[in-house]
Amino acid sequence: LIEATSGNTGIALAMIARLYDIEIELAMPANSTRERVLTMEAFGATVTLTETIESARDYAVEKAASGEFFMLNQFENPDNYLAHYKTTGPEIYRDTKGTITHFVSSMGTTGTIMGASMT
């Protein structure tokens, strides 16, 4: 496996890869926290640092194109936003009894904010 990440997804993928004895390389920007890098490495991931998140994505896409790696591609995978459309959005709407007026979310892959806003 190979994936570009800025942190949380990479940590989760490193944990799962370790559980299933799958090799994984994670590409991330060089300004990522040392803690995140060490956590991924502790789970057995190979971490490659690039200049930016965009260059991390380019690196992962290029490696996947070689046929030696499979890329989950969190940034373009429609299941990313669909998961939040089907679960997160309806849960927020239900829990606020439809009275929600504002929703604040980080903009990592934008999957959460895109999916939840479609509800």
Model regions: which residues?
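A short, small-residue-rich loop immediately preceding and capping a beta-strand
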Residues: L1-P29, T99-T112
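Amphipathic, positively biased hydrophobic alpha-helical segments used for protein targeting
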Residues: R18-D21, S55, S117-T119
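Small/polar-residue-rich loop-to-helix segments that shape phosphate-bearing ligand pockets
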Residues: I22-H102, S106
